[in-house]
Amino acid sequence: MAGAKEIRSKIASIKSTQKITSAMEKVAVSKMRKAQMRMAASRPYAERIRQVIGHLANANPEYRHPFMIERPVKRAGYIVVSSDRGLCGGLNTNLFKALVKDMSANREQGVEIDLCVIGSKGATFFRIFGGNVVAAISHLGEEPSINDLIGSVKVMLDAYLDGRIDRLSVVSNKFINTMTQKPTVEQLVPLVATPDQDLKHHWDYLYEPDAKELLDGLMVRYVESQVYQAVVENNAAEQAARMIAMKNATDNAGDLIKELQLIYNKARQAAITQEISEIVGGAAAV
């Protein structure tokens, strides 16, 4: 029965792992709901300021902020939003694939790359893959604050204003629904005119106290809000991906336990049959 004992030990080990993955699934469900609430709370502001910025990009304001002026791209910057922890399926892998594809397209055109990395997984990836990381931040926790992001975002915005980079994009996972998370690369600056039907015409604004003072503050707030929204959505996507990954692990453990239980029963049945045969054979010899 040595084989049966080994199988029984494997079953016990898998059941123990199954309990852990089941508990992690339940925790991920709870965290995902909280992350969705934070995402829903911050989304109206992010979408509204994006709409206003879209109007400005289509308008002819009296003052053209540097973020509104396109120039030849010799160096591009990326703010990469990844997770701090693993066990979330292919969430980070798919994000890095989308980023590397976009970076490769830029490099083919002779464009150099600077990176601002948010999240431990992104930092680990670029240590292995290579890349010019000029700013990094991690361990933002379950409830990230925009104040934690301002320093890293400022590094990239200063680089743009100083002419060290000519385009800045944010790379993150969009939370579509519980089952779907989509890696996206979105240009932040220079501003991209919004193609909405409502913006087919030009918008004119009156600026108080003056256009320069207002736009200087508004543009920075716009970038900060978009990066913060990307972090919040990526957090929700991470918890959803982890929930699905842990559910799949729990289900797979259940299937494996059933298979091993069947093998164990067959081994036990074979051992009992052999013992009976030996007893019958011994009795016949007597």
UniProtKB/Swiss-Prot annotation:
Main localization of the protein described in the UniProt heading: membrane
Domain of life from the UniProt record: Bacteria
CDD domains attached to this UniProt entry: F1-ATPase_gamma (cd12151)
Pfam families: ATP-synt
Cell location: Cell inner membrane
UniProt GO cellular component terms: plasma membrane; proton-transporting ATP synthase complex
One BP annotation, GO: proton motive force-driven plasma membrane ATP synthesis
Membrane topology qualifier: Peripheral membrane protein
Keyword vocabulary terms for this entry: ATP synthesis, Cell inner membrane, Cell membrane, CF(1), Hydrogen ion transport, Ion transport, Membrane, Transport
GO molecular function: ATP binding; proton-transporting ATP synthase activity, rotational mechanism
Family recorded in the similarity comment: Belongs to the ATPase gamma chain family.
Subunit field text: F-type ATPases have 2 components, CF(1) - the catalytic core - and CF(0) - the membrane proton channel. CF(1) has five subunits: alpha(3), beta(3), gamma(1), delta(1), epsilon(1). CF(0) has three main subunits: a, b and c.
Function: Produces ATP from ADP in the presence of a proton gradient across the membrane. The gamma chain is believed to be important in regulating ATPase activity and the flow of protons through the CF(0) complex.
Name the record gives this protein: ATP synthase gamma chain
Lineage: Bacteria, Pseudomonadati, Pseudomonadota, Gammaproteobacteria, Pseudomonadales
